[in-house]
Structures are given as C-alpha cells and as structure tokens.
Amino acid sequence: MSLIEHIDSAQQTWETVTEGVEKIVLRSKPGENRVLLRIAAGKGYPKHGHSVPDEVFVMEGIYIDPFVEGGKEFGPGSYLYYPAGTEHNATTSTGCTILVWNSNVPK
C-alpha cells in the first residue's frame, strides 16, 4: 500500500525567497520539486533557466512572463510549460500565487 502524502498549505509558513517573493515547498526530493510561489504586486522572480522542463500553474492573480509574447498576462487556471533550457522570469501587477513543478536542477 502506498503512503499518500499531504500538506495543508494554509498551515505552512511562507519562506522569503527575495523581496516580495515567498514560497512553500510542497515536495523536494531528488528529481522532484513542487513549490507554491507567491509574488507580491509589482514584484518579480529573477530571470533563470533549468536544465529540465519547468511547469507553472497560475492559481490566483495575474502572472506575467516578459519572455512570452512580449509580456503576455496569464490568469487563474493558466498553465505554462517551459522546455529545458528556456530562460524565463515572473512578474505581476496584481500579485499572484503559482504552483511550480520541475526536477529542481538549476541551469
């Protein structure tokens, strides 16, 4: 029988990544990384890339990536797939919460 892991994110403490950016690590094991990322209005996550694919699901607010169609806005329910090696960053005018899924291998 498999053990089902669960986390109540409402009971977790947000960890500061950089000014205006916080995270809750949901899963971090070799080859597995699941993170809730909360970005304050007017703030952003620095440009970066990964040697593996990176996936983003927008849960709340407006997520903007200046590298996608010149800064396209993505609302709740939007899904983005970044192929391995793709540089990207995140900004928001409203504040946003996203779920990030990757293999935790920085480029």
Language-model-detected regions and their locations in the chain:
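Short acidic-glycine-tyrosine-enriched beta hairpin
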Residues: F67-G85
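Conserved short histidine dyad/triad with adjacent acidic residue
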Residues: R27-H50, I64, P83-G85
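Ligand-binding loop in jelly-roll beta-barrel domains
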Residues: A84-K107
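A short, N-terminal "cap"/entry segment at the start of jelly-roll beta-barrel domains
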Residues: M1-G31, L36
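Glycine- and acidic-residue-biased ligand/ion/polar-headgroup-sensing regions
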Residues: H50-V68
